[in-house]
């Protein structure tokens, strides 16, 4: 019997949390084929614990204070004693450090790397990286290549698709989504919208999400006189919201392998995104979307203006983007890749 302990202690319901939820049934199925279990562990009182309260099998929960907090470390040790895991797979640094302290030496350790900031332990830990750039970084930092694995994120294939530029009676709608945080670059999108307005283009922008940057963004929208064109609409169901758009803007500064970009591609939206590690693995410039320098409002405005001016080309980008997601980034692809990696970790002598 092979037991897996699968841990994620994020408090929100963003990309990291969604990847954990995507992994959990795959790991449960993998363990069940070997007569074992996969125990999912989340932060007590966090968004995932609340959203998954009726799940079968249930997720375990624990406190998530500091790495050395006696209550938190004690909970990790109790969970390890109860589950007796052969493999511990963690999302993020905190659960990785906690369960490394709590785990017996016989346990195989793995961490899913979502961003280019992570601890390195070269003798015992496998690194499951959601982007090729993250896998390359792990090897550069000294992790043996045999312990580094590339498993790109995936999305459920939506049944409702965008219909870009299908309604000539309304202005083109540019949509964006994500946590309202400086690294997401939504201030760049607001500045690009001001440039588009000054060029006399008709359009509207809707940004879905919440976060600490809301007040600043509201101020920028007012400062540029864009209140009638740019709206912050709060959190929305991602696929349904994205399907209302004609174009998707992704002006981020730093990413792993962003789910919301995959979701936009999956509904068939033409995309204008920052040419940064992660997105540049997902989009082929001039074939499945547009890539442009991060932080460059003029370049973003130019790309969006070009797409608006040539709807046929934009629609073609969206179709190619969706085809790429269907081919490489659906649930079946994730299950196959992740299961193969867990096989390798479990079978290593």
What are these regions (language model features)?
Residues 6-72:
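N-terminal strand-loop element at the rim of the active site
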Residues 284-286, 290-297, 306-311:
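Conserved acidic donor-binding segment of nucleotide-sugar-dependent glycosyltransferases
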Residues 253:
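Aromatic "clamp/platform" in nucleotide-sugar-dependent glycosyltransferases that forms part
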Residues 133, 154:
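Carbohydrate-associated surface elements
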Residues 213-216, 226-235, 241, 290-291:
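Active-site donor-binding acidic/aromatic loop of nucleotide-activated sugar
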